[in-house]
Amino acid sequence: MSIDTALSWFSTQTIWVNCRWKRSLLRARGVAMGKEHVGKGVNITLGPMMNIGRAPQGGRNWEGFGPDPFLAGVGAYETILGMQSAGVQACAKHYINK
């Protein structure tokens, strides 16, 4: 199987999108990511990343939806619904944080 990686859409960082606290934007971003995956022949995406970034030295906190568990949950929920509505299976990552 060959996956075309020549053209890719890039969104702003997840944490910045969640700071807008606009559910429709989170859902639309998920749809756009899902459509890109489907267009490239990908059935399952390893995302979104749901780590709440409790430890600042973690280094990848910008990938998540922020440190608030409720806001992170809503952000992930809307993103997953958007991705899956486009026909790709979402697989939330890093959900449990020690």
Task: List each language-model region with its residue ranges.
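Glycoside hydrolase catalytic-domain context in secreted enzymes
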Residues: 1-98
